[in-house]
Amino acid sequence: MAILLAAGLGLGLAGCSAPVTETTAAPSPTVPPGIAPLRGTPVDPGGAEHPSLAVKIDNHPAARPQLGLERADLVFEELVEGGLTRYAAIWHSDVPDEVGPVRSIRPMDPEILSSFGGIVAYSGGQPQFVDAMKATPLLNVIFDDDATGLFVRAEDRDSPHDVVLAAAETVRLHSDLAEPRAQFDYADGAADATAVTAGDPTATIVTRFSESGGRAWDWDAAAVAYLRSQDGAADLDTTGTQLRATNVVVLRVEVDRGGEVPRTILTGSGEAWVSTGGSTMPATWFKDGPAAPIRLADAAGATIELAPGNTWIELVPADDGGVELVP
């Protein structure tokens, strides 16, 4: 029987929703040397001594399959116009040669990305959104202003879903920038992750950002990962492999719909659900400001530890969005 957790799109708000605790979680997480700060997995000595690369990635049906998305350490899915979603993907431990399709910046991206430092790449955007992104600590690499040749238009894709970035070369050119700080806490191994030890079995996670379609994550024990589907079909990368995540974190967020573009509010706190290893637990998310990392806490205020591996963060609107957990 499905457990309905967030209101919107006909999903009722059930009594098992995550409590909002009064205390914040522990201070910003740290990782020991030799551990990838955005993934919690081992890296070769010196292998993390370069900046992270955040890129705005298209999720329009015409943009799929995306390039390099399966190798991102972290992927944020955010609501944009027309009920569609777009990704803010961050690469650090494994940077592909190419990523894309690259799209424009949105008003919530400074709040999402400021804590990473490093580089942010995007195609352009409304002047006020570009100015806000340029005001962050990140180095901005913009297709509309590019004279370096780092961006190209792919001949086998239609505009505007055709802008591709030379990701590894972008990082190499700016290797003097600092590596990112850790954003989440990680357990020593998958079996020790908090959701595994304290959560309830979850076979499928269904999230809805609007009436325009949904996406699902199905637990695959053989793959030791959640496999992603979108609009009723497997969500594939350019090699034909289904996108997957070690951790799926759903944040219930407010959305400012007063302008032409919806703006996710990612400061403050709210309900969350953390899924790892086929289990899910309720949580509370905290973000003290744009430059602060997201913190995840259980009902007692203790820090939640993710399993080492990649993480997708679903920024589900509190008004028109919904999340459904299927045991």
Language model: regions and residue ranges:
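A surface/extracellular/periplasmic glyco- and lipid-processing/surface-interacting theme
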Residues: 32-72, 81-90, 95-327
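C-terminal motif of bacterial Sec signal peptides marking the signal peptidase cleavage site
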Residues: 12-15
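Bacterial N-terminal signal peptides that target proteins for export
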Residues: 1-4
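Bacterial signal peptide processing site
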Residues: 17-20
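Ser/Thr-rich, Proline-interspersed low-complexity disordered segments
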Residues: 24-32
